[in-house]
Regions:
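S-adenosylmethionine
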Residues: 1-464
Length: 464
């Protein structure tokens, strides 16, 4: 982004926000970032929805692709380091900002995220923040404060960073407490530390992982996934995309479909299937797959993904609770809707858009879905339940409660089911991963290549 155009003369205080955005490249991106940060923090709006390239926020859609990428980078840094940024700001203020200066707080967070965490000129972050303040009637009177505060932080960046919070301070207090309660202080600290880094990209490949690791410039993981730290350019330009030789899927997300046993030639249902990564795995394992999802649009995406891979599956757009097939399945996979708290590395808005009440409601829904899933399987058939939540209410506690269902017999997962990642199997026979698994020590200390999504899986058999 070219941020070097001279600022308007002091006497020119009449241009609208829109005119300023035209006059000063980079301004509209910063204004958009502050606006979207407010939507996440104040209204619990999903960042994915706000930055969707088809249906996102109008202010975001009005930007050029390069500025959209900048907005996403700013928001990622702002949310991953929210507590650290807040502390850095508050320590350098003589008095707290007024409670109603909400727009100002978002503007400052966006600017400090650039100064501390992005490879952008500090002076651009400062100048554009001041200009954005002047362009907004709510913030105009604080323009001098914005200028002084940000210049002070940019001059003493290293000192400011050294005094910021520990990683657990970058998520809401309830979220931090729930993770500490579930995993203990040491494991929780490792999880929070991994939240600070964008995740690498994992691929599920159809053939030789070592070969594809070489072709894609990555490494083969113990389970056969291929990991690449970053991809320059579009995924669609990578070797093997057009040929359907691989699909993107976090290593943790690839594990539940591998717990089904021998499903070659068997009828298997993927009950919450879109976007289709697990569906593709089931087809790859030789199953006759029926993929369900409530959303026809999401199923359309799934069918497109399978078509690229050269795979086929029956698709059914329906609410799972209404699904009553004429013939029962040999096995079902229920990757249930959840709080997604295991995906904070790739979705840093999750701690701010989810609440404890959401987790309770989702756990209740999961219990109902799992109970119904049990009715869709032949006696002796396998049911795998999974989700990408870190919270025991949606995982271990859910599985223990499900075991009380007279149709569900626990079928413990063993180390043989998870070759190479045996440490993820718990003493109760569940699969539990966290972002702290596959730690940096396994990658020469590099956190950018480490970690995995938080996932839970439990396996059952249908009682006769």
């Amino acid at each position: 982004v070219n941020d070097k155009k001279p600022a308007p003369k002091r006497g020119n205080n009449k241009p609208s926000v829109q005119n300023n955005a035209v006059e000063r490249p980079g301004l509209s991106a910063r204004q958009c970032a502050a606006r979207l940060l407010g939507a996440v923090i104040e209204k619990n709006t999903s960042l994915d929805g706000l930055t969707d390239n088809s249906h996102g926020h109008p202010q975001y859609l009005a930007l050029e692709p390069r500025d959209r990428a900048l907005v996403r980078a700013i928001l990622g840094a702002s949310l991953r380091n929210r507590g650290a940024i807040e502390r850095a700001i508050s320590k350098r203020l003589d008095r707290p900002l007024p409670e109603n200066a909400v727009a100002l707080k978002h503007l400052l967070h966006v600017a400090v995220a650039q100064i501390f965490y992005l490879n952008l000129p500090d002076h651009s972050a400062v100048d554009l923040a001041v200009e954005a303040a002047n362009a907004d009637p709510r913030n105009r009177k604080y323009a001098g404060l914005v200028n002084a505060l940000l210049r002070r932080l940019s001059r003493n960046k290293e000192r400011a960073l050294a005094h910021t919070l520990l990683p657990e301070g970058n998520v809401p207090e309830w979220f931090a407490k729930s993770i500490v309660d579930a995993y203990g202080a040491e494991k929780a600290a490792a999880i929070f530390a991994m939240h600070a880094y964008e995740p690498p990209i994992d691929f599920t490949v159809k053939s030789d992982p070592e070969l594809w690791a070489e072709k894609l410039g990555g490494i083969a993981l113990p389970n056969g996934s291929v990991r690449v730290q970053t991809v320059e350019g579009a995924l669609t330009d990578l070797p093997g995309f057009a040929e359907g030789d691989w699909w993107v899927q976090d290593v943790a997300a690839s594990l539940p479909a591998r717990l089904m046993g021998d499903i070659n030639g068997k009828r298997v249902a993927d009950l919450c299937a879109a976007p289709g990564g697990k569906t593709a795995q089931l087809v790859q394992q030789g199953a006759d797959v029926t993929a369900l999802d409530m959303s026809e649009n999401r199923l359309k995406r799934l069918r497109g993904n399978l078509e690229r891979l050269g795979y086929e599956a029956k698709t059914v757009a329906t609410n799972l609770m209404d699904f009553a097939p004429e013939e029962l399945f040999d096995a079902v996979l229920l990757d249930a809707p959840c709080s997604s708290t295991g995906t904070v590395r790739r979705h840093p808005d999750v701690p701010w858009t989810k609440t404890p009440q959401d987790i309770t409601k989702l756990a209740d829904l999961q219990g109902k879905l799992l109970a119904h899933a049990a009715t869709l399987v032949k006696p002796g058939g396998v049911i795998v339940f999974s989700n990408c939540s870190l919270h025991p209410l949606e995982g271990e506690e859910m599985a223990r409660k499900a075991a009380e269902n007279p149709l569900l017999e626990p079928f413990p997962i063993t180390v043989d089911d998870c070759a190479g990642l045996e440490g993820l199997i718990t003493s109760e026979g569940y699969l539990r991963s966290t972002p702290a698994d596959l730690p940096p020590e396994r990658f020469n200390g590099d956190p950018h290549r480490a970690g995995m999504d938080g996932f839970f899986a439990a396996r059952f058999k249908r009682r006769a």
